[in-house]
């Protein structure tokens, strides 16, 4: 029987735990940073502080750690590094972790080498894996000639966790969106490369998928740019995910356009 622990017990964990249990896996540990839920139980398993994860992973020795916390690779690096060091498989909904090699190559290479050294798998998966990645590569494999691949996808950030909502700029004024999100892309190619090499680049979710697709299809990327455009609504919207009312005219999310 596969034994698993859950790292991050927010909205997405409700589904990952359910799916794992439905597949016959055994739930042996849970971790979070939220003081309001630490000490409570999920399916009879007590949620422990995230700070105790390393010690408990050494004790529990699960087969896999499911990580559902943040969207940026640098924000899940510590727990992935712990898992890789201990030889524990880890799978995460962190969108950048699907293909971090074109946005955080130094950190990705460190985790990759450590996982191979200790004979375990560290991977990112989720919506983009199935529908933006493998579905497209499968269709491409059955196509005689491809000149361009164009795609568009939309989803409700309210259905996901706070990390995704914040990464999309939901709840920001348009000025805040411009300063904190959109302006980050108004840089030269040289400046972008420096940010990427330092691990400070903020990729939209499609950035990593485009890199994955090019790698999968054997293509060499000569240039890649992204632009993030705020989306708004004509009326106030209450967000339980953000625990706030997103006022009329504020950003409800964004449209991320990546061209490779």
Residue spans of the language-model regions?
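NAD(P)+-binding Rossmann beta1-loop-alpha1 motif at the extreme N-terminus of oxidoreductases
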Residues: 1-26
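NAD(P)-binding Rossmann-fold cofactor-contacting core
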Residues: 15, 22-43
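Conserved N-terminal Rossmann-fold NAD(P) cofactor-binding segment
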Residues: 34-60
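Rossmann-fold NAD(P) dinucleotide-binding segment
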Residues: 56-64, 73-95
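Adenosine-phosphate binding glycine-rich loop
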Residues: 118-147, 154
């Amino acid at each position: 029987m596969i034994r698993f622990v859950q790292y991050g017990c927010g909205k997405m964990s409700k589904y990952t735990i359910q799916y794992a249990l439905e597949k016959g896996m055994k739930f042996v540990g849970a971790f979070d940073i939220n003081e309001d839920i630490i000490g409570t139980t999920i399916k009879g398993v007590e949620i422990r502080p995230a700070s105790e994860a390393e010690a408990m992973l050494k004790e529990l020795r699960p087969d896999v750690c499911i990580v559902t916390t943040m969207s940026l690779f640098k924000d899940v690096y510590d727990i992935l590094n712990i898992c890789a060091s201990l030889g524990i498989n880890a799978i995460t909904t962190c969108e950048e972790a699907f293909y971090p090699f074109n946005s955080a190559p130094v950190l990705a290479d460190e985790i990759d080498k450590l996982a191979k050294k200790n004979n375990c798998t560290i991977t990112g998966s989720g919506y983009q894996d199935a529908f933006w990645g493998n579905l497209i590569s499968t269709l491409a494999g059955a196509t005689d000639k491809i000149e361009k691949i164009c795609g568009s996808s939309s989803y409700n950030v309210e259905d996901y966790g706070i990390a995704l909502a914040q990464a999309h700029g939901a709840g920001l004024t348009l000025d805040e969106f411009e300063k904190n999100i959109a302006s980050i892309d108004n840089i030269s190619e040289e400046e972008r490369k420096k940010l990427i090499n330092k691990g400070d680049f903020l990729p939209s979710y499609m950035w990593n998928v485009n890199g994955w697709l090019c790698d999968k299809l054997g293509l060499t990327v000569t240039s890649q740019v992204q632009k993030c455009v705020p989306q708004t609504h004509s009326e106030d919207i209450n967000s339980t995910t953000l625990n706030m009312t997103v006022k009329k005219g504020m950003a409800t999310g964004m449209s991320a356009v990546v061209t490779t």
